[in-house]
Amino acid sequence: MKLVFEKIESLNSTHIDKNQDRLPKVQKWQMQLAQTGFQTLGRIFPEWMAKQAYDIFSTPRWRAKHSRTDEIIESANVYDFVFEEHFVKVYEWGNPQDKIILLAHGWESRGTALRMYVAPLVSLGYCVVAYDAVGHGDSGGKQNNVPTNARTITALIHHYNGIYGAIGHSFGCSGLVYALQYVDNTLSIEKLVFLAVPYKTKKIIESFFTAIKAPDGLKKSFYSIVEKLNNRSIDDIDITKSYLHVKVGQLLLIHDRFDDVTGIDAAEEIVHQWDNAKLLVTEGYGHFRIAKNPDVLKRIVAFITDN
C-alpha cells in the first residue's frame, strides 16, 4: 500500500525524552575575550583577523566519541577511505550490492551517531553506509566546511556507484545538496531525508558574526574567503534555491518547532520551494534528540521503503 504524506504535517509523538540537547561549554570570559579581540584587531587588521575567524568557524571544537560500544557499532564493516589528503573512516552494514542509504552526520558529531537507522533498514534489504567527516570522529584532518564535506560525500557516492537514499542531519544536509548541485550534478538520490536542515549559509555566518561581534571590515574579508573557497557568491549557497539544480526523487524534511540551533524557517521555506518535498514537524525534541525519536525513525523508514 502506498503511503500518503501531507505537504506539512505535525508528528504527534508520545515518546518522552528527558535528555537535554548537548551544547558546547564556552565560558563567559572566553567569549568576552574573543569578542574584544575581534572588535579591536578586526578594525586594524581586518584581513588577518578574518582568517583567524574563519579558522575558528571551520574547526570543530571537539571530536565526538562513544563512551561505550554496542552491537550496531561492533557489527559494522569499518574501513579507511582515502579522500584527497585524508583518511575518512567509513562504516558499512549490510550487503553493498543492495540499495545504499548514506548517513551524513552533523557538525561536531560522527557517522555512528545516526546508527539507530541501521537495523531497521538492513532488515528490509538495504545497505547502510556512514562516515566520519573530515576533522570529525576518527577521520583525519582538523577543519571542515560545506564544500569539503560535499566532496567527501561525492567521492563516497562514486565509490558505491551511486546511492538510493540519504539521511542528513544539519551540516550533513548542506553537504548532500552541495554535492548534488555543485560537485557533480549528474548524481541523483531517489529518497532524501533532512533532519534539522540549516538555513542559508549567509545567515549562519551572520549568526557567527553576531557571536564574535565582528566589525564591518572583518565581515567583508570573511565573505571574500568563503566566496573564494566556494568559487561562487555566498548568496548562491542556499538550499532553498537548489530545487531546480539537483536530481532528487522525493524529499522528507523533519524539524522540531523549537529547534534553537537551526530554526524551522529553512524547512518551511524549502517545503514550499521544492515541489517534491514534505515537512514533518515535531515539538519538544530539539536539534539533536529529534534523530533518536522512535516515531521519527518509523516515519523515515516508511518514507524510504515506500515505492
Per-region residue spans from a language model:
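An N-terminal hydrophobic leader/cap segment in hydrolases
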Residues: 24-81
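Conserved alpha/beta-hydrolase
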Residues: 111, 118-140
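Alpha/beta-hydrolase active-site loop
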Residues: 143-164
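Gly/Ala-rich beta-loop-alpha elbow adjacent to hydrolase catalytic centers
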Residues: 167-176
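Hydrolase active-site cap/lid region
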Residues: 183-233
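Short beta-strand/loop motif that positions the catalytic acidic residue
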Residues: 246-247, 252-255, 259
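Conserved alpha/beta-hydrolase "acid-adjacent" motif
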Residues: 260-266
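Catalytic histidine-centered segment of alpha/beta-hydrolase-like enzymes
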Residues: 285-295
